[in-house]
Amino acid sequence: LFAMAGMLSTIPAAYFNARVLNDTALNFFETPDIRMGVLGVFLAPGLGEEFWKMAAGLLVVSCLNRRSRPVQPAECVLGFAVVGMAFAVIENIWSYGDGGAAYLLLRGLIAVPLHTSMCMLHGVGVLLYWKRRRAWPLYVFYLTTALLHGLWDVASIYGSSVREIWLPL
């Protein structure tokens, strides 16, 4: 179930990314203003992908908790890790046509651990939510992973150009 949720979560995430890339001035690949591009990176891959991965894992955990025995803590964190791995695999398949085998290998070495670790953090947030019955861990862990994902994407897309963003500020 977790793997299927991870694969399916790529659909709304890809749609959201496409809307940001095609319908706004936040197209981080083509915008002449690097600040708008960085904002686009944080909104689309950062906030968008992390939201859909967390929602997919949370849906599975919620369904499992209602239908059978409660999901154990290790199962929750590992289940979310599976969501991240499945998401990364589908994302890499979609990206394959853009760069060839070397690019796919590099994405496999970087994107899979990134998505897996971000989803494991989602799993910890969901555990804290279920344990304490307070929503703040969901928000804190979601925003933390979105920030980390956004920072990684900014560094990988813009590289040394990132200095241009912070110097004027």
What does each of the following model-derived ranges do?
Residues 1-169:
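Hydrophobic alpha-helical segments at protein termini of multi-pass membrane proteins
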